[in-house]
Amino acid sequence: MTLTVTDLAIARGGIPVLEGLSFTLTPGRALILRGPNGAGKTTLLRTLAGLQPPLAGRIEGAEDKIAYAGHSDGLKPTLSVTENLLFWAAVFGGRDITPALEGFALGDLADRHAGNLSAGQKRRLGLARLLVTGRPIWMLDEPTVSLDRDAVAMFADTVRAHLGQGGSALIATHIDLGLDAEVLDVGPYRARPAPLDDPDGDFL
C-alpha cells in the first residue's frame, strides 16, 4: 500500500507549522523525517496517523493501514508484558504475539508487569506492539529514545524485516539506523507566519 501526501498543511495548537508538503511512501521503503525541534515532525506523524485533522491537502492510502508509535508507549502498567501484547493483538485482530516477544527480546520479561519495567524495557515493549498490529505502514516518533546500543540494533533489524516483507516506515529520528532510506527534511515546508495587522494602516 502506497501512502501519498499532497500539498499538506498542518497545525499544532491552532498554529500552522507545515504547509505545501508532498511525498509518497511506497512498499518496502523507509523515509527518515528530519528537522529542528519544534518544526512539526511529531504533528506530521500524528496527522498522518489520523490522530488530528490536517488544515489542507490530501492523505491517500492511510485508511486502517498505519501503526503509530509516539513518545508515549501506551502500555497498561498493571498488565504483564504478555498481557499487554495480547491486548493489542486483540484490538488489531488477534495476531500471534510470539514474533513480538522474540523480536524485541522480551521472552524473559513475559510475566513481568509493564509498570515494573525499566525505561528501555518499556520502550521495547511499546515498539513490539507494532508487530501485532498487522499494519503495513509504520509511523515512528523518535523510536530509539531510552534504548541502548543493542536495542537500537534490534529495532533496526525489525524495521529491515518489516520492509523486506513489503511494509514501509516513516521515522522521525536523529540516530543513524543504517537503513537504506531517503531523508525528508521538513524545514523547507515550515509555515510562513501570518502577516501582522497594521494598526496605523487606516491613517496612511
Swiss-Prot record:
<comment type="subunit">
    <text>The complex is composed of two ATP-binding proteins (CcmA) and two transmembrane proteins (CcmB).</text>
</comment>
<keyword id="KW-0547">Nucleotide-binding</keyword>
<dbReference type="GO" id="GO:0015439">
    <property type="term" value="F:ABC-type heme transporter activity"/>
</dbReference>
<dbReference type="Pfam" id="PF00005">
    <property type="entry name" value="ABC_tran"/>
</dbReference>
<keyword id="KW-1003">Cell membrane</keyword>
<keyword id="KW-1278">Translocase</keyword>
<feature type="domain" description="ABC transporter">
    <location>
        <begin position="3"/>
        <end position="204"/>
    </location>
</feature>
<dbReference type="GO" id="GO:0005524">
    <property type="term" value="F:ATP binding"/>
</dbReference>
<protein>
    <recommendedName>
        <fullName>Cytochrome c biogenesis ATP-binding export protein CcmA</fullName>
        <ecNumber>7.6.2.5</ecNumber>
    </recommendedName>
</protein>
<dbReference type="InterPro" id="IPR027417">
    <property type="entry name" value="P-loop_NTPase"/>
</dbReference>
<dbReference type="InterPro" id="IPR005895">
    <property type="entry name" value="ABC_transptr_haem_export_CcmA"/>
</dbReference>
<dbReference type="InterPro" id="IPR003593">
    <property type="entry name" value="AAA+_ATPase"/>
</dbReference>
<keyword id="KW-0201">Cytochrome c-type biogenesis</keyword>
<keyword id="KW-0472">Membrane</keyword>
<dbReference type="InterPro" id="IPR003439">
    <property type="entry name" value="ABC_transporter-like_ATP-bd"/>
</dbReference>
<dbReference type="GO" id="GO:0016887">
    <property type="term" value="F:ATP hydrolysis activity"/>
</dbReference>
<dbReference type="InterPro" id="IPR017871">
    <property type="entry name" value="ABC_transporter-like_CS"/>
</dbReference>
<comment type="function">
    <text>Part of the ABC transporter complex CcmAB involved in the biogenesis of c-type cytochromes; once thought to export heme, this seems not to be the case, but its exact role is uncertain. Responsible for energy coupling to the transport system.</text>
</comment>
<feature type="binding site">
    <location>
        <begin position="35"/>
        <end position="42"/>
    </location>
    <ligand>
        <name>ATP</name>
    </ligand>
</feature>
<keyword id="KW-0813">Transport</keyword>
<dbReference type="GO" id="GO:0017004">
    <property type="term" value="P:cytochrome complex assembly"/>
</dbReference>
<dbReference type="GO" id="GO:0005886">
    <property type="term" value="C:plasma membrane"/>
</dbReference>
<keyword id="KW-0067">ATP-binding</keyword>
<comment type="similarity">
    <text>Belongs to the ABC transporter superfamily. CcmA exporter (TC 3.A.1.107) family.</text>
</comment>
